[in-house]
Amino acid sequence: MTVRPDIAGQDTPTTVENADITVVGGGGHVGIPLVLAFAEAGLRVNVNDLNQQSLDALKSGRLPFIEYGATDVLAKALANNRLVFSNGSDRISAGGPIVITIGTPVDEFLNPVRKVVQDCIDAMLPSLSDGQLLVLRSTVFPGTTDWLASYLATKGRKLKVAFCPERVVQGFGLKELREMPQIVSGATPQAERDAAALFEQITPEVVVVSPIEAEFAKLFNNAYRYIEFAATNEFYLIAKSAGVDYQRVLMAMKRNYPRAQSIPRPGFAAGPCLVKDTMQLIAFARNQFGLGHAALLVNEGLVLHVIDDLKHRFDLGTMAVGLLGMAFKADIDDVRASLSYKFKKVLSGQARAVYCTDPFVTTDPDLMPLGEVVAMSDLLILCTPHTAYRHADLNGKPVVDIWGHLEGANVIR
């Protein structure tokens, strides 16, 4: 690929036919930062997505979810005619690379579902040309990249298949694409070279490895992070069982001690990636990934431990409880796989009433303003440590904070 600075401020609109690159799932959490990064680099981008609501938002210059620093980049891309929006597998550009932000989800038996990728490829095949670069971007089960290359060969198609995993943090994808190395792999040497050339346009460094190494790198990164959360959560539970404030222990561990700086705070560790990717490794290892199993038990079980502790401290059946924060992490609006909702479900069978609030989430009609939740609740639980809660007026109500986010006489660790 060649960077296209010549089209800055171009009068000719980008079309499906003249786009330099197509991002399938371009209206999603993985796709939008990538779309904007390529547009910022001067490419004409076909933003392909089945979610018409997301496409309509982007067309109007609005982001469908929080992506910090992206609004101005989107406005510039629209003003410079860098983007075209398409819906459906028959609207894939026949020239230029195709980046697919659809991975292998986990089914109800905790097994990866490769058929999702296969169905996506099958739907697009009539629109693709031999020689095109096909890049898998989302997490896939180990072996999927080479499997896809073989699968396409059995169909008589000569496409270059690559796997270049996304590895950015939610809400800061565009920023991290500019700053962090991108892992690149290809099923053939030519696919590898083309994928590296593509991503060199938007990132300071590419790290070239084999497909299976890239697939493991993505899964290992996320599973390791999930295990880190499990370790600190178990430390929290051990300290609590001894009547010790874990936040003070954590402060002592980390104070000017470099080797402890990566230890995270305890809290509800979840989200759409960490749990799923750990499950993928468990499935790949034929259920022999002991640390992964243990991490799931600790992180998912933390909700039950907190509720059990509340039952010993309070007469929950007579109390209204307010949950502060429903997103899966701080200062974003994404509720996918958020443990706040597990907490709500379990607590609803224990407390007289449960009320929920979140300053960022707009997709849940049951959420209430913070002031109303505080006024109606006898007890508050900090589920997500949004920055805004640090200085919120909680009317002196008792608030359970396992994160160590709040200060005050009313805070219960």
Model-derived regions, located:
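Structural/interface elements that position substrates and couple domains in central-metabolism enzymes
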Residues: 2-413
